[in-house]
């Protein structure tokens, strides 16, 4: 199975797999059962911003999700990613729908990673930024139902021609280039990711959520991972 570290913006509480009984932000380390969660006041039809950061000195992974004009939600978890992830990874966004559904629209996405070694400052820095997404993106690997639309948005899950979200959908977008996330000689390894998103739903209970994830470079969508597994894990263990 893939090695996955993820931040989930989980819109639907699947209490049978350990979710709290409300929409939440969670940090997932190699399992859909989050290590840390915080209640998320999800606002459908409004653009939100998610910011994820990590550095190897504090060994803390933090996510902040906010909507303009309202308070933000923060979740963090202390973890040494050197012990979890391979040295080279890919970073991506995933989303799913299930019985209930929602649009999982990404409007922008940026990422910066830095490795500081004693010898050369920032010798290994990687940065990318999408303010809009082209129709046939050369710099993204689209998996499952993920597509880019004529408005320059990334639709992670299936929408009809009229823009209505479809159920039982799973899609992911990964940056094409592998990222050197850590190395043994690095003094500091850090990364920051930011994406803006829009979730809309005709259902009173939208589902299932969006994630930012880091995985081994040959990662693929596990079969049967739509709905509560958020396109990341083959099972709920």
UniProtKB/Swiss-Prot annotation:
> InterPro entries per the record?
ConA-like_dom_sf, Lectin_LegA_CS, Lectin_legB_Mn/Ca_BS, Legume_lectin_dom, Leguminous_Lectin
User: GO: which molecular function terms?
Assistant: D-mannose binding; metal ion binding
This molecule's function is given as:
D-mannose/D-glucose-binding lectin. Also binds derivatives of glucose and mannose such as more complex glycans.
Q: Which residues form the signal peptide?
A: none
Q: Where does Ca(2+) bind?
A: 10, 12, 14, 19, 208
Please tell me what else the database record remarks about this protein.
Answer: Binds one manganese (or another transition metal) ion and one calcium ion. The metal ions are essential for the saccharide-binding and cell-agglutinating activities.
In this chain, a carbohydrate is annotated as bound at 12, 99-100, 228
Among PROSITE patterns, the record links this protein to: LECTIN_LEGUME_ALPHA, LECTIN_LEGUME_BETA
Protein name in UniProt: Mannose-specific lectin alpha chain
Q: What keywords were assigned to this record?
A: Calcium, Lectin, Manganese, Mannose-binding, Metal-binding
| Maturation and modification | The beta and gamma chains are produced by partial proteolytic processing of the lectin alpha chain by an asparaginyl endopeptidase.
Instruction: Give the family from UniProt.
Output: Belongs to the leguminous lectin family.
Looking up PANTHER family in the UniProt record yields: CONCANAVALIN A-LIKE LECTIN FAMILY PROTEIN, LEGUME LECTIN DOMAIN-CONTAINING PROTEIN
**What Pfam families does its record include?**
Lectin_legB (PF00139)
Q: Where does Mn(2+) bind?
A: 8, 10, 19, 24, 34
* Oligomeric form and interacting partners: Homotetramer.
Say which species the protein is native to: Cymbosema roseum
